[in-house]
UniProtKB/Swiss-Prot annotation:
Residues 479-482 are annotated as: G4. Residues 370-537 form the tr-type G domain. Residues 515-517 are annotated as: G5. GTP binds at residues 379-386, 425-429, 479-482. Gene3D superfamilies: 1.10.10.2480, P-loop containing nucleotide triphosphate hydrolases, Translation factors, Translation initiation factor IF- 2, domain 3. One of the essential components for the initiation of protein synthesis. Protects formylmethionyl-tRNA from spontaneous hydrolysis and promotes its binding to the 30S ribosomal subunits. Also involved in the hydrolysis of GTP during the formation of the 70S ribosomal complex. It holds the Pfam family IF2_N. Residues 73-101 have a biased composition (Basic and acidic residues). This is Translation initiation factor IF-2. Residues 425-428 are annotated as: G3.
């Protein structure tokens, strides 16, 4: 089993690590630091010692304490001699014991006789002992003749004088023989039952055992010797010299209702089915307890020793409606702890599989060497970040990206003056915020690229904030200095407003004017980078286990899951066993950014590895471990934790949230299956699509993954109504296309992220309810009202504005207030029907269902126009 560290024991018990180290050293363990690991058995002993304050038996030999060892050894030797002699010559043993214990027996005989008298009196008055015997222990009384008194007293004295409480093997064998003889004698005896009364002249031997043991009817072959139950009340002694483990072959007698001395008094219990021991559970008041961050109500109640209903009622009194399966947040846990008067220690269950925390970096200075600096290039979209890196690498990466914008995180190695520099190129598009944050967190120096003709833009500000949050040095590269519209002073002024002050203005930030097109200032930029790296004194230990960051991951045909990494400490070699989040495996192959095979990747260098069990999440920390088993355990624990966390989301809502939940259920959703070429792009797309929503519509990503579109994706889409499959930088195969056509599933692929987002916006707009607006057609004044039999009222009007159309919607307005809305039922010009009447003409207007028209009212005509909604 895996060893347990001291700090883990301290965290579980809620103690400081120093206290645990002190307690461990009290047990004789040589613990020096909290990171020392011990075996699980030793950890359990430390735990027991701290909880009970009693030194475990296994550690007593390590502690030097004054003990009376000499008398114990003498007693043991004497006992062994007596047992051996008892086997060979029982009669000689009795005489020997009588001589050794002669003086002690005299005193003991008197005590035994007094006890015998008391027992006989108690036997005649069993009803007076009913209440007392419940709290006291019971035993056996062996009634024998006087000839065996000395032998009995010798045995009794041996038990009393012995420091060892447990019964030795020889005594157990003799007792077994005695009880087996008793069984045989019972078979020989007649069926009629007799009651026995102990004589005053008989001596006794009492054997007391724990209450859990049952005693059957016991008698010996000798007719003059009978075993009776001892119902005498004894003063309860302190359980200092009582052995917890008693012989299993002796059971406590369970008599029937007749009682001792009456007909049918004591019965034998079947030996085939021994009675189950009933453990008496004592409810202990919990004063302090360790609680995990994510705990359900019933789990919390179990931890603090309260009933679930009690906890739920307490929460109800605090204004929280919960069920037993609901999760408690930290605030609720602290409030409940205060209510119940319990001290809590909130722990994080994720620490159990935090392999990064368990990773110990070697700090031996003799093994530390200077490593390559890691530089991240950040800035606004289309400001020339990738073009600048292309000039440094003498390559053309930007031209190969769709739309001329970077949509992947790339890691590249460059040599300058015999020294290696690792560059990370991040996207500038607003959708790739997570990628920029990830790049800033694993870098040593950040280069912010700003176009001289464009100035500071939103993503420029965001990149600066990421760099400041990461606490890394910033170098400003003013690009496109070869353009006529270049204005570096404008850039410096804008950045100065953000507290990025140039060195020449008295600040601490280096500004370098460069041109990715002509190469101007590139050498100066690299010199400043190396100078800054020297100031930082970047060092790492290449001899330790490797620790790396995954900046991108994907699935490649024929290779499986691949990951782009930057090693931060140690050296990663081919064949190393690694774990990264839920992914683990053995490194089968490694290559650099140009595809050249590598055998090892040193600290500060980047590369691509193959061999992970699945696509690791971008941003995960990759650690090399000793064995495959250890890696698998870490990954499986993380997977199970994430799965349980996802499945056990709380369903409780407050009254304020209830309306929002109902409204959420009424939202229209666009089901989408999303596939991308790399993990980083998939993450950016998911974040962008989830933002495309309003009070009426949203995007529901039913499945997402890295890799090509498969037939299972088509099957899932066909099972979901009105769903579409979106692919980014991937193309479906012929079989998948045919399958999609048969199932009626639409597949859309893109290679530019904003094209995908624009199309999804258009789809969402089509699903939204159209925007209805009114268009005013005209207005007419009622100058006469005519009542026509069987038809109703007809208004004689003069059109004052626009036109009045037959069938148009109208409003009847009186004193500026709308009194009726309806449609034009009839429209006539003199006696002829008309489709419309223009301004300045008289007409007769009939309004459907309206019989309350008056002279001086106005009729307003309008029509409703529907417009397509957009997100």
């Amino acid at each position: 089993m895996a060893k347990i560290r001291i700090h883990e024991i301290a965290k579980e018990l809620g103690y400081d690590s120093k206290e645990i180290i002190e307690k461990a050293n009290e047990l004789g363990l040589g613990i020096k630091t909290a990171s020392n690991a011990v075996e699980p058995e030793i950890a359990a002993a430390i735990y027991e010692y701290i909880q009970t304050r009693e030194i475990p038996e296994a550690f007593k030999k390590n502690i030097k304490t004054p003990t009376a060892k000499k008398p114990k050894k003498e007693n043991i030797k004497e006992q062994e001699k007596l047992n051996e002699s008892e086997k060979k010559e029982p009669k000689k043993e009795e005489k020997l014991k009588q001589e050794v214990k002669k003086e002690e027996l005299k005193v003991e005989k008197e005590n035994v006789k007094e006890e015998e008298k008391q027992e006989i009196i108690d036997a005649h008055k069993p009803q007076s002992l009913a209440s007392a015997t419940l709290a006291k222990r019971r035993g056996l009384v062996i009634v024998k003749k006087k000839k065996d008194e000395e032998e009995i007293q010798v045995k009794k004295e041996e038990v009393k004088n012995s420091n060892d409480i447990s019964i030795n093997n020889e005594e157990r064998l003799s007792l077994k023989t005695m009880f087996s003889n008793a069984d045989e004698s019972l078979k020989k005896k007649k069926k009629e039952k007799k009651s026995f009364v102990a004589s005053k002249k008989e001596s006794t031997e009492k054997m007391n055992f724990l209450d859990e043991h049952d005693f059957g009817d016991i008698s010996l072959d000798d007719e003059d010797e009978v075993v009776l139950p001892d119902f005498s009340v004894k003063e309860q002694e302190k359980p200092q010299n009582i052995n917890k483990k008693q012989p299993n072959f002796i059971r406590q007698a369970v008599g029937n209702s007749a009682g001792f001395g009456l007909e049918g008094g004591i019965q034998r219990r079947s030996r085939k089915k021994p009675p189950k021991k009933i453990e008496k559970k004592e409810v202990e008041e919990v004063s302090s307890v360790a609680i995990s961050k994510e705990i359900r109500v019933y789990e919390f109640a179990d931890k603090i020793g309260k009933s679930t209903s009690e906890v739920i009622s307490k929460l109800f009194m605090l204004g929280m409606m919960t069920t037993k399966n609901d999760f408690l947040d930290e605030d609720a846990i602290e409030i409940l702890a205060a209510e119940f008067g319990i001290e809590i220690n909130i722990i994080n269950e994720a620490d159990e599989f935090d392999y990064v925390k368990d990773y110990e970096e070697e700090t031996d200075e003799k093994d530390l060497v200077t490593r390559a600096p890691v530089i991240t290039i950040m800035g606004h979209v289309d400001h020339g970040k990738t073009s600048l890196l292309d000039y440094i690498r003498k390559s053309r990466v930007a031209s190969g990206e769709a739309g001329g914008i970077t949509q992947h995180v790339g890691a590249y190695m460059v040599e300058k003056n015999g020294r290696k520099i690792t560059f990370i190129d991040t996207p500038g598009h607003e959708a790739f915020t997570a990628m920029r944050a990830r790049g800033a967190s694993i870098t040593d120096i950040v280069i912010i690229v700003v176009a001289a003709d464009d100035g500071v833009k939103p993503q420029t500000k965001e990149a600066i904030n990421h760099a400041k949050a990461a606490g890394v040095p910033i170098i400003i590269a003013i690009n496109k200095m070869d353009k006529e519209a270049a204005n570096p002073d404008m850039v410096k002024t804008q950045l100065a407003e953000m507290e990025i002050m140039p060195v020449e203005w008295g600040g601490s930030y280096e500004f370098v004017g460069v041109s990715a097109k002509t190469g101007m200032g590139i050498e100066d930029l690299l010199e400043i980078v190396l100078l800054q790296a020297d100031i930082l004194e970047l060092k790492a230990n290449p001899k330790s286990f490797a620790k790396a960051s995954i900046i991108e991951s994907s699935v490649q045909k024929g290779r499986g899951a691949v990951a782009t990494i930057i090693v931060q400490n140690g050296t990663l070699t081919v064949g190393s066993t690694v774990v990264a989040g839920e992914a683990y495996g053995k490194v089968r192959a490694m290559s650099d950014d140009q595809g050249k095979a590598l055998k090892e990747i040193k600290p500060g260098e980047c590369g691509v590895i193959v061999g992970l069990s699945e696509v690791a999440d971008a941003g995960e920390i990759l650690i090399a471990v000793k064995t495959d088993k250890e890696a698998r355990e870490y990954a499986n624990k993380r997977h199970e934790y994430n799965r349980q966390k996802e499945l056990s989301k709380s369903t409780k809502v407050s009254i304020d949230e209830l309306g929002a939940k109902i409204k959420e259920g009424n939202l229209k959703a666009l089901p989408v299956i999303l596939k991308a070429d790399v993990q980083g792009s998939l993450e950016a797309l998911k974040a962008s699509l989830e933002k495309l929503r309003n009070d009426e519509i949203k995007v529901n990503i039913i499945h997402s993954g890295v890799g090509g579109i498969t037939q299972s994706d088509i099957e899932l889409a066909s099972a979901s109504e009105n769903s579409i499959v979106l692919g980014f930088n991937i193309r479906p195969t012929g079989e998948v296309k045919e399958r999609a056509k048969d199932k009626g599933v639409e597949i859309k692929t893109y290679n530019v992220i904003y094209n995908l987002l624009d199309d999804v916006k258009a789809l969402l707009g089509g699903m939204m309810s159209p925007i209805i607006s009114e268009e005013q057609l005209g207005q007419a004044e009622i100058r006469q009202v005519i009542n026509v039999p069987k038809i109703g009222q007809i208004a004689g009007c003069m059109v004052t504005e626009g036109v009045i159309n037959r069938g148009a919607k109208i409003r009847l307005i009186r004193d500026g207030v709308v009194v009726y809305e309806g449609n034009v039922s009839s429209l006539k010009r003199f006696k002829d029907d008309a489709k419309e009447v223009a301004k300045g003409y008289e007409c007769g207007v009939g309004i459907e269902g309206c019989d309350d028209m008056r002279v001086g009212d106005y009729i307003e005509s309008y029509k409703e126009v529907e417009e397509q909604a957009s997100l």
